């Protein structure tokens, strides 16, 4: 049985819309108001700089991962397969699109079970929090086992669902389901937002539920309410939420260093300098998605390799110019904030009680 044409068309429309970043980019991620400290007396060899990181038992080449994007249908599956192979070559983690589709079309599991192409890196499966409630813990756990992944991402995407005419409306029970899932799986559990961010208090709640890692996925990147609004020709409502959400930088600045060790940051991180600033602010890993999608669709695999080569060089240059040989030296003490950002962050702290 083939996948319903409307499902495939929806996925294709998502890709087409996301390829035009100016139409679906949300708010501001405030990274341009972070400045990295300059050290004119860096007294070591540039070749000594080490940006390798360890995560889930793997040594990865840099503190960057490719975030989950799409899956299902020939175009999405070919895209995922290509990216997994690229990620394996680069030695960086990668997340796959939601496997929700497999509960209706289990015969397509091979399109999602891509560990055979990811021997050297962590591979993440992905499912919505609502689907844990919908399909039950046991079925989710069994699917995770069949996919042979290294971790599971549970995404929170209420805004997108509420903007989708056929999206989910009942989110009752997601906290209990996340807590239960953490007790029944043998791989790390990552919870992520999908472009609206996670507040400091919600970060603490998620860790109390048993979550291993959190991807803040803040505002400033792809806004999925706008994506759904464009797909459904309903921008009158969607545009009201064009600047909704929490930039990941505000949450990073609000939580202590011990929590940051289990925090990923994403949401509008596109350049090597964006990545350098996110790491300097203390994130364990930085997630990139739409910028990779556009590079791949514009110019193919070579463009993706070039993108990550740039990331590596800019991160290393930033570390050298701030006097840092290692990521541990670079994190949390090599930046300062502009007066504008300090003022905005002050309002944030007052509003969110941090």
Curated annotation (Swiss-Prot):
Keywords: Cytoplasm, Flavoprotein, FMN, Isomerase, Isoprene biosynthesis, Magnesium, Metal-binding, NADP. GO terms for biological process: isoprenoid biosynthetic process. Its cofactor is FMN; NADPH; Mg(2+). Substrate binds at residues 11-12, 98-100, 160. Its main location: cytoplasm. Its EC number is 5.3.3.2. FMN binds at residues 67-70, 98, 126, 192, 222, 289-290. It holds the Pfam family FMN_dh. It comes from the Bacteria. Gene3D superfamilies: Aldolase class I. Mg(2+) binds at residue 161. It catalyses: isopentenyl diphosphate = dimethylallyl diphosphate. The keyword Magnesium applies. NCBIfam families: IPP_isom_2. Homooctamer. Dimer of tetramers. Involved in the biosynthesis of isoprenoids. Catalyzes the 1,3-allylic rearrangement of the homoallylic substrate isopentenyl (IPP) to its allylic isomer, dimethylallyl diphosphate (DMAPP). Belongs to the IPP isomerase type 2 family. This is Isopentenyl-diphosphate delta-isomerase. The gene is fni.
């Amino acid at each position: 049985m083939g996948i319903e044409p409307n499902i495939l068309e929806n996925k294709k429309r998502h890709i087409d819309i996301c390829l035009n970043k100016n139409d679906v980019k949300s708010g501001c991620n405030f990274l341009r108001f972070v400045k990295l400290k300059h050290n004119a007396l860096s007294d070591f060899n540039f070749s000594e700089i080490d940006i390798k990181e360890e995560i889930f038992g793997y040594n990865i080449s840099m503190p960057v991962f490719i975030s989950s994007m799409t899956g299902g249908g020939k175009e999405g599956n070919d895209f995922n397969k290509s990216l997994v192979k690229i990620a394996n070559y680069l030695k960086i983690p990668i997340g796959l699109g939601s496997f929700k589709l497999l509960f209706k079309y289990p015969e397509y599991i091979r399109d999602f079970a891509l560990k055979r192409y990811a021997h050297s890196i962590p591979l993440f499966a992905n499912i919505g929090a609502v689907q844990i409630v919908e399909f039950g813990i046991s079925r989710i756990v069994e699917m995770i086992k069949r996919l042979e992944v290294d971790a599971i991402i549970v995404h929170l995407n209420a805004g997108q669902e509420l903007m989708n005419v056929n999206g989910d409306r009942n989110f009752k029970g997601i906290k209990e389901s996340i807590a239960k899932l953490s007790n029944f799986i043998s791989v790390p559990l990552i919870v992520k937002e999908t472009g609206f961010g996670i507040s400091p208090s919600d970060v603490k709640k998620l860790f109390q539920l048993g979550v291993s890692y959190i991807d803040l996925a803040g505002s400033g990147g792809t806004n999925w309410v706008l994506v759904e609004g464009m797909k459904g020709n309903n921008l009158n409502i969607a545009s009201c939420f064009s600047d909704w959400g929490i930039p990941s930088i505000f949450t990073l600045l609000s939580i202590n260093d011990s929590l940051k060790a289990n925090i990923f940051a994403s949401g509008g991180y596109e350049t090597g300098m964006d990545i350098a600033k996110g790491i300097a602010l203390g994130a364990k890993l930085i997630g990139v998605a739409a910028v990779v999608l556009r590079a791949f669709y514009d110019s193919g695999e070579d463009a993706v390799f070039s993108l990550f080569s740039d990331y590596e060089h800019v991160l290393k240059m930033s570390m050298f110019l701030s006097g840092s040989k290692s990521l541990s030296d670079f994190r949390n003490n090599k930046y300062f904030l502009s007066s504008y950002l300090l003022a905005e962050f002050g309002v944030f702290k007052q509003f969110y009680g941090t």
